[in-house]
């Protein structure tokens, strides 16, 4: 859900989840600060100092999502999440001890060893486009577990739909586009082809 809704405690009064509301608010606030700090560090590593992420990624545009993956006897043939890249700037993921997250590297799927005491940071499509390809959005998936259910929580650093994404270096690898345009193209591709095409749609050479 959008982070701004988590800050609205009235959302939880009907369910009497006051303690949950407080915990989620603290968690979302902490992850938001961490995400902005990481975005700043990554951009400064490229020699680019900017308030861009502070100005575009606000509480009403970022998301916190809690995921539950039921046990599945057909595992690993059944995915909890199909292979994809994240359509944001940064994702901060916390997973339990069950495991199931896999990243693709050199054409092979590599399992990420679960560590409940650690956070996983994913570069998203928007950061790849903004950094002009310096940072890469890695394809990942979730495989189910035969015997145990899996839980994870993800924070997505997202801009408003009207935010223009432009490469910060010249010559640009990707053309300028808004977050709304990107999301609409992803949805259209999934509808027409059954999968996300993503950033290749926005390469300068493709237009």
Feature locations, PLM:
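Non-heme Fe(II)-dependent double-stranded beta-helix
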Residues: 1-27
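C-terminal flanking tails of non-heme Fe-dependent oxygenases
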Residues: 18-207
